[in-house]
Amino acid sequence: MNKLVVEIVDASDLMPKDGQGSASPFVEVEFDEQRQRTQTRFKDLNPQWNEKLVFNVGDLKRLNNKTVDVTVYDDRRDNQPGKFLGRVKIAGAVVPLSESESGVQRYPLDKRGLFSNIKGDIALRIYAAPIDGGDFVSPPPDFAEKVMKEDKRFESQEFQFQNQNQNQNHYEQFEDEINNMETLKPTKKKEKESRTFHSIGAHAGGGGGAPPMSQAKQAYPPPPNQPEFRSDFMRAPGPPTGAVMQMQPPRQQNPEFQLIETSPPLAARMRQSYYYRSSGDKTSSTYDLVEQMHYLYVSVVKARDLPVMDVSGSLDPYVEVKLGNYKGLTKHLEKNSNPIWKQIFAFSKERLQSNLLEVTVKDKDLLTKDDFVGRVHIDLTEVPLRVPPDSPLAPQWYRLEDKKGMKTNRGEIMLAVWMGTQADESFPDAWHSDAHRVSHSNLSNTRSKVYFSPKLYYLRIHVMEAQDLVPSDKGRVPDAIVKIQAGNQMRATRTPQMRTMNPQWHEELMFVVSEPFEDMVIVSVDDRIGPGKDEILGRVFIPVRDVPVRQEVGKMPDPRWFNLQRHSMSMEEENEKRKEKFSSKILLRVCIEAGYHVLDESTHFSSDLQPSSKHLRKPSIGILELGILSARNLMPMKGKDGRMTDPYCVAKYGNKWVRTRTLLDALAPKWNEQYTWEVHDPCTVITIGVFDNSHVNDGGDFKDQRIGKVRVRLSTLETDRVYTHFYPLLVLTPGGLKKNGELQLALRYTCTGFVNMMAQYGRPLLPKMHYIQPIPVRHIDLLRHQAMQIVATRLSRSEPPLRREVVEYMLDVDYHMFSLRRSKANFSRIMSLLSSVTLVCKWFNDICTWRNPITTCLVHVLFLILVCYPELILPTVFLYLFVIGMWNYRYRPRHPPHMDARVSQADNAHPDELDEEFDTFPTSRPADIVRMRYDRLRSVGGRVQTVVGDLATQGERIQALLSWRDPRATALFIVFALIWAVFIYVTPFQVIAIIIGLFMLRHPRFRSRMPSVPANFFKRLPAKSDMLL
C-alpha cells in the first residue's frame, strides 16, 4: 500500500497568541479527507516536533489532484477552538516519490485572510513511499477533539514546564491508540486550491535542500542532497480552463528541453536577518550563491641555505608537493641556493588520498635522476582553517629532513599550509590537483579570469568638399570619390553630382574605434578612371588620438582644411612642395562621439545600454549575482580521442566577461564560482555559455567547441530572490537540435535604488544622442559587425586569450543571417500575438449570435449604461485592465525564461532548412540544391505577394469611394453620406449609438446569412488589380 509521509520537524518565529508573549502550538495535517495532528509544545515560539504522520494514498497517480494542508494552531486552555498561527498548502504533484529524493524544507506560513497577523515558518519533509502492511487510517474528527481535550486537561493540571515530559508521555498513549484504530468514515471537506513552493526567499532563513519535484522534474530528478533548511515563497497553480482574457499557457515542449528547478545547499538560504540581505552590500553576499568547496592550500614561498648537490658547486632546485597520488611541481631555478618560487597548490578536500602532506626539494638533473635534497612532512589534522575575510596565513620556516626523517644541518623551506574554500584569494592562481596533467606553460589556459571589453566609440567624419585637385591627366576633369580607412574598416563616398576640380560631397561616414586610440585614419581622394581602376590624387593621415571628443548634444566641432599629400611623391618632392606652400585640400569635420552607445550585440538581447562617455553614465540601480554551480549529463566532446570533455563557462554582462576554470575529463563538473555585476538597466540580458577547452595541452589551431548557451533577461527576475535551476544546453546543428547537457545556475538580482529602477521604465532605452541625431539604419548592422570584430580581436589577445570563436558565439555574430526556421518562428510569434485578437472577435461574434443569452443580455445592459453615461467608458476600460492584471498575477511565471526550443521552431525543423541555415555566404552548396531552395523561396514569395496584393486591393477600394472611378458608386456614397450627416445632426448621439449597438447585437432570428449591403457595396468598388500586367 502506498503511503504519504509528512514529517513535522520544527517551526520558528511564530506569532504569540496567548496574550503573554508566547503560544502553545500544535500542527494539524489533512490529506484526502484524512486528518492527523502532532503533540502540543507549551509556551514555545520555536517548537520542535520531529514527528512523522503517515497517510494512505492508494494509487500514486492520485497525488497530482490532491493537496496536503498543514495548519498550525495555538492550543488554548479554555475549551475554545485553537487560534490560527498559519498554514501551508502543498500540491501533491510536487511530492517526491521516494525518501531519497526528499529533503527538509522550510515553508513560510501563509495568512488565512487579508488582515491576518501571521509570521514564521515551518520545516517539513514530505515524500511518498510504498509501505507493506495494512492500511493506515487517520482518526475521526471527534477523536481528534478528544485528544485536544486531553492535552488541555494536562495543561491545566501541569502547566509548569518541569512537568511537560509527563504530558508528552501521556500523549504518546493516545498516539498509539490512533495508530491502531480501524477505518472510520472521514469528514468530507472541499479541496481548496493548491499552491506549490518553488522559489527561494533571499531575506528569510534556511538553507537549501532537495525540493519537491514537479511533473517536469520527475523526468530528470536532481541528485539527492543532504537535508537542509530553506525559505520558499508560494507558487500559484495553473490557470483554470475557460477563463476569459487570462494568460495563455505556452505550448508544451519536450520535457528534455524544459527548465528544472533545484535546491542546492546555498548559504543565501540560511540568512534570517532581513536587514542583512536588504542592505545590498557586495561583501555581505560574497560566495553565498555557491556551495562551499574546501581545498588544502600549500604555498611554497622560498628556501634558503640549500646544500650543494652538483660537482660544479651549485644546484637547480625545485619543489615537489605530493599528497597521495597527486603531485605538483614548481619551476626549477638554475644555480640558486636561495630560490624564491611563490607558487600555490590547491588539493580538493573531496579527493584527499592521504593524511600526510609531503613537500620534497629536489635538484634538477638533465642526464640522470633528480637528486634528493630534503623534505618536510605535515600532518593534515593540524592544518588550520582559514576563510576570508580572515587575513592571509603567515608562512613558516621548516627545516628539511633526510630520507630517514632526521633533520639536516642545512636547508630550510618557507611554507604556508591551510584549509580554505574557493573564496580564498589564492584560488584563481593556484595549481589545482584536478589539473595535474596540464603543463606549466598551458596552466593559464585552465584558470578562471575576468576580462573587460574595450571601450568603444563612434568616429564621425563629415566629408564636405575638396579644392584644387590635380589629376595626372591635365586635360581631364576628375571623377573624384573619397575613401576613408580606420583600422580594418573602409568606407567610400559617392561620386559628386558635378565633375569639377573643386568637388563637393557632404556625406557623413561612421566608424568604430576603441581605446587606446592607436589607429590612424587614412583619407584618400581618388579619381575613378574606369571600372575597378582608381588613381589616388592625394591623401591625409589623421591620428585618432588627435580627434576631438564630443561628449553630448551641442555644437559640432568646426571643420578643418587638410593638405592632401601626393601618393607617389618622394620626400624631396614633398619638402619642395611645402616650400611652395601649395597642395590640394579637403574640408573635413572629424569628431569622436562619446554620447552614443556602441552596439556590439543584437538589440534584442543587449546587456549594456550605457553611453561610451563615463561622465554621461547614470549610477547603478542594482547588483546582479551569478553562481555557476555545476553541469550534468554533458556530451563527451572528445570522444573520438578516447577522452571526455574539458568544460569551462563564460558569462557576459555589460563590458565584463568572466571565465571559470577548466575541469578536466568531467561530464558532471562542479565549478561553484560566483561573480557580480553592477546593473544600470533591468531591461538587459545576461548570457552564459559552456565550451570544451581544446587548448589544455597546446591544442594548436583547434577551436573550442560550443556546448550550449543560456540567456536570462533581468527584468523577468524578482528582486532579492534566488533562482536555482538546471538550464538545458541546446545547440542547433545541421543534423538537428542537440542537447549537450544541463547547466545549474544560481541568480539573484538585488535592487539598490527602487525609485531609480522604477523610473528607468519611463526613460529611453538608448542614450539621447541616438534619438536627437540618429544613426542611419543602413549603417547600424555594419557598425555592429565592426564592433563585434574589435571586441573579439582585443579579447583574443589577452592572456590567457578569450578566443574569437567563443566571443562570436556569445555575441551571436551570425544572428542577422537568413534562416527559414527563424522566419517561421517569427511568423508563429505574430500568429500567437494575433490569437488574442481572434479570441476577442470570436467572443464578440458569440455575443452577437446569442450563443449564451445570459451573457448577451449582460452585454446589452453594460452597453446601455455606457451609452447613457459616456463618462464611464474610460474608467471602465482601465478598471478592466487592472482587474485582468490582478487576476493574472496568480498565474505569473515563477521561473526565469530560457532559450525555448518550441518557440525557436528548432525541435521540428526540416533537415534541409537547417542545412540552408548553416550554409556559408556566398553559398557553397551544389547547383541543384541551390535551384531547389530558390524554387522554394519563389513559392513562399508568391504567397506573400498574394497577401500584399489583397491588402493593396482593400486600400484602393477605400480610395475609390470618392475618386469617381466608378461614377455610380461614388454618387451613391456621397448621397448616403449627406443623408447620414443630416440624420446625425438632428438626432442625439446616444440615440444613434443605441440604434447601431442594438442592430449589431440583434437576435439571430433577425439576421440573414447573406452578406450585408455595405459589404456588397464595398466589394464592388474598383481597384488597380485589373491594371496589372
Curated annotation (Swiss-Prot):
<keyword id="KW-0967">Endosome</keyword>
<dbReference type="InterPro" id="IPR013583">
    <property type="entry name" value="MCTP_C"/>
</dbReference>
<feature type="binding site">
    <location>
        <position position="363"/>
    </location>
    <ligand>
        <name>Ca(2+) 2</name>
    </ligand>
</feature>
<comment type="function">
    <text>Regulates flowering time under long days. May function as a signaling molecule by regulating the trafficking of other regulators.</text>
</comment>
<feature type="region of interest" description="Disordered">
    <location>
        <begin position="187"/>
        <end position="224"/>
    </location>
</feature>
<comment type="similarity">
    <text>Belongs to the MCTP family.</text>
</comment>
<feature type="binding site">
    <location>
        <position position="365"/>
    </location>
    <ligand>
        <name>Ca(2+) 2</name>
    </ligand>
</feature>
<dbReference type="InterPro" id="IPR047258">
    <property type="entry name" value="C2C_MCTP_PRT_plant"/>
</dbReference>
<dbReference type="GO" id="GO:0010008">
    <property type="term" value="C:endosome membrane"/>
</dbReference>
<feature type="domain" description="C2 1">
    <location>
        <begin position="1"/>
        <end position="111"/>
    </location>
</feature>
<dbReference type="InterPro" id="IPR047255">
    <property type="entry name" value="C2D_MCTP_PRT_plant"/>
</dbReference>
<dbReference type="InterPro" id="IPR047257">
    <property type="entry name" value="C2B_MCTP_PRT_plant"/>
</dbReference>
<keyword id="KW-1003">Cell membrane</keyword>
<dbReference type="Pfam" id="PF08372">
    <property type="entry name" value="PRT_C"/>
</dbReference>
<dbReference type="GO" id="GO:0005829">
    <property type="term" value="C:cytosol"/>
</dbReference>
<dbReference type="InterPro" id="IPR000008">
    <property type="entry name" value="C2_dom"/>
</dbReference>
<feature type="transmembrane region" description="Helical">
    <location>
        <begin position="976"/>
        <end position="996"/>
    </location>
</feature>
<feature type="binding site">
    <location>
        <position position="310"/>
    </location>
    <ligand>
        <name>Ca(2+) 2</name>
    </ligand>
</feature>
<dbReference type="GO" id="GO:0016757">
    <property type="term" value="F:glycosyltransferase activity"/>
</dbReference>
<dbReference type="Pfam" id="PF00168">
    <property type="entry name" value="C2"/>
</dbReference>
<dbReference type="InterPro" id="IPR035892">
    <property type="entry name" value="C2_domain_sf"/>
</dbReference>
<protein>
    <recommendedName>
        <fullName>Multiple C2 domain and transmembrane region protein 6</fullName>
    </recommendedName>
</protein>
<dbReference type="InterPro" id="IPR047259">
    <property type="entry name" value="QUIRKY-like"/>
</dbReference>
<dbReference type="GO" id="GO:0046872">
    <property type="term" value="F:metal ion binding"/>
</dbReference>
<keyword id="KW-0479">Metal-binding</keyword>
<feature type="binding site">
    <location>
        <position position="316"/>
    </location>
    <ligand>
        <name>Ca(2+) 1</name>
    </ligand>
</feature>
<keyword id="KW-1133">Transmembrane helix</keyword>
<dbReference type="GO" id="GO:0009506">
    <property type="term" value="C:plasmodesma"/>
</dbReference>
<dbReference type="GO" id="GO:0005886">
    <property type="term" value="C:plasma membrane"/>
</dbReference>
<feature type="transmembrane region" description="Helical">
    <location>
        <begin position="864"/>
        <end position="884"/>
    </location>
</feature>
<feature type="domain" description="C2 2">
    <location>
        <begin position="277"/>
        <end position="398"/>
    </location>
</feature>
<feature type="binding site">
    <location>
        <position position="365"/>
    </location>
    <ligand>
        <name>Ca(2+) 1</name>
    </ligand>
</feature>
<keyword id="KW-0472">Membrane</keyword>
<feature type="binding site">
    <location>
        <position position="363"/>
    </location>
    <ligand>
        <name>Ca(2+) 1</name>
    </ligand>
</feature>
<feature type="domain" description="C2 4">
    <location>
        <begin position="605"/>
        <end position="727"/>
    </location>
</feature>
<keyword id="KW-0328">Glycosyltransferase</keyword>
<keyword id="KW-0963">Cytoplasm</keyword>
<feature type="binding site">
    <location>
        <position position="310"/>
    </location>
    <ligand>
        <name>Ca(2+) 1</name>
    </ligand>
</feature>
<keyword id="KW-0677">Repeat</keyword>
<keyword id="KW-0812">Transmembrane</keyword>
<feature type="domain" description="C2 3">
    <location>
        <begin position="437"/>
        <end position="562"/>
    </location>
</feature>
<feature type="binding site">
    <location>
        <position position="371"/>
    </location>
    <ligand>
        <name>Ca(2+) 2</name>
    </ligand>
</feature>
